[in-house]
Amino acid sequence: MSFHWVDILIIALYLGLSIFIGFWISKKAGQSIQNYFLGGNKMKWYYLGLSNGSGMFDVSGTAWTVTILFVYGLQSVWIPWLWPVWNQIFVMVFMAVWLRRSGVMTGAEWITTRFGSDRGGRLSHIIVVVFAVISAIGFIAYFFVGIGKFVVTIFPWDLSFSLGGVTFINEYVYATILLSVTTLYVIRGGMYSVVATEVMQFLVMVVACVAVAWFAMDKVTPEQLDAAVPEGWYGFWPTWDKGIDWTGIFDAVNDKIASDGYGMLGALVMMMFFKGIFSSLAGPVPGYDMQRVFSCATPRDAAKMSGLTSLILYPPRYLMVAGLGVLGLVFVTPVLKAGGGEIDFEKILPWVINHMLPAGLRGLLLAGLLAAFMSTFSAFVNSAPAYIVNDLYKRYIRPDAPAKTLVRASYFSSVGIVVVGIIFGFFSESINSLTLWITSSLYGGYVAANMLKWIWWRFNGYGYFWGMVAGLAGSTLKFIFFPETPDIYLFPLIFALALAGSFLGCLLTKPVEEETLLSFYKNVRPWGWWEPVYRKAKALYPGITRNGDLPRDSVNVLVGIVWQMTLVVAPIYLVIRRWDGLAVSLALFAVTSVVLKFNWLDKIKDYEQV
C-alpha cells in the first residue's frame, strides 16, 4: 500500500520533534555522570512518572498484548502476571522509599552499601553489573524483533539488501534504522533527553490510544463481536480446564494456545502469583525503572512517582489494545483463515493498522507506536551504560577520571550495548519466545538472592553471588534439558536451586561487617529479620525507630493489585461495551483509590535522620 501524505507528515513531524527535544535539552547532561544518568536528582517526580510509564509502553509488548487478547479474551489480562506487572505496586508501596534512601546511582552501587567492599561484596557487585547488561541486551533484542515485525507490514518501501552473501531482510533493516535514530539523541542528552522526549511521546501515545478506541467502537457493533468470538471469551476469571475452545470458529487458534502453554490458565495464574510475590519482594531489576527511582529528589517523591506510573500507563494502553483487538477479531480473522499455511498472530496489530485505519488516524497511531518504541528503548539505552561506566570503568579502571571522560565513556558503552542487542535480535524466533526467556528463566535466577538481601540481616555478598550463579545455571539447564516445558512451570525448581546457592554461599562464609550493616539499616530501614542489627543500632543511635509497616504494606499491596487490575479491565470493558463489567471495575477503582489515599499516600514518610 502507499502512504497518504498526511500520514507521512505526522510521522515526520513526530520524529523531528523527538530529535529536536533530545538535542535541545542535552547541554545539561554533559556536566557530570550524575546529571547524565540521573538528571542531577532535580527532575520533578511527575515528569519521571510520565517518563517511566512511557518507557513501559512498548511496541513489542503492545503487539503481544493485542495477540493474547485476540486469543484468550478477557482472561488475557492475567497473562502479564508473568512479569509480574504488579511488581510496580510493591515498588510504589514500600520498595521505592527503601531504594531512594540509599542515595546511589545504580543497583550495583546499591549492592556495595548492603554488602560492603570485601571480596563477597565485590563478587555480588560484579554479578549485578553482568545481570544488568545481559538483561538490557535481551530487551534490546526483544525490541528489535517487535519493531521489525511491526514496521515491515506497514511501511511500503523495501529496504532489504545483500552484503557479502548475507541478505538483510526488511524487518532487520527497518529495526536497525529506528534503533540507531533513537540511540543518537539518547547518547547525546542522557537522562534529560530521555525524560523530556518521553513526556512528549507519552502525550502523543494518549491521543493515539483514545483515537483508536473511538474508531473501533464506531466500526464494530456488539453483535459483530459476539459472532466473532467463542463461548468464554468474555469471561474474566481464569479457568482450570483446557480453556477457550475456538473449534469451528478459528481452529488454528487452538494450536496457538497449545504452543503458548497457557491452556490451563487457572493453574498458570497460581504459578504466576507464587512467582510474582517472590519476584516483587526482590525489587525492581537493575534497569530503567530502578533508575527513575534513584533520579527522584526524595524517597517520598520516588513512591509517588511509582504510583503515578501505573495510573497513567494502563488506561490509555488498554484502550489501544482493546480497540486493535476488536478490529482484529471482526475484520482480520476472515483474512487469516483464508490465507492458510502458518499464521503469525503477532502480525495482527500491523495488519489492522495497514488495512483498517483511515489516513490521518493511521499516521497518528504510527507516531504513537513509534513513540512507545522509542521511549522504551531509550530508557534501556540510558540505564544500562551506567553500570558499565559507574560500576566498572570508574570503580576499577579510572577512579579519578574527569566528568567529561566518564560521559564520553557512556557514549561508547551505549553504542556497544545496542550493537550487541541487535546481533542477538537476529537469532530470536519471536516476541513470545523472548518474553518467556526474559521473564521466567533469566529473572528466575535473579529472584532468590535479591529477595533475601532485603529481609535477612545475615545474608552476605557470597550468598548473593552464589545464589545468582545457581539461579542462572538452573535457567540454562532448563533450555538444555527441558526446552519444550513452559518456563513458568519450572520456576519453583530454578528458585529452589537459587535458594540453595544463596544459603550455602552465605552460611559457609562470615557475615557482612557490622559497620556496613549498621550503616545500611540506619539509612534504609527495611522490615524483615533485622532484630540483631536493630538492637546494635539502638544502642548507638537511641533515637532510631523500627520499621513496623509490614502489616500495612501487605494490605496496601493487595489493595494495589486490585486497583491496578481495574485500570487494565475498565478500558477493555468500555471498548467491548460490557457495561456491567465497566461499572464493577470503576466502582472497585474508586474504593481501592480511597483506601490507598488514606492508607498509603497520606502515610508515605521518610525515616528520621540519626
Predicted regions and their residues:
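Membrane-embedded helix-loop-helix hairpins and adjacent transmembrane boundary segments
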Residues: M1-V610
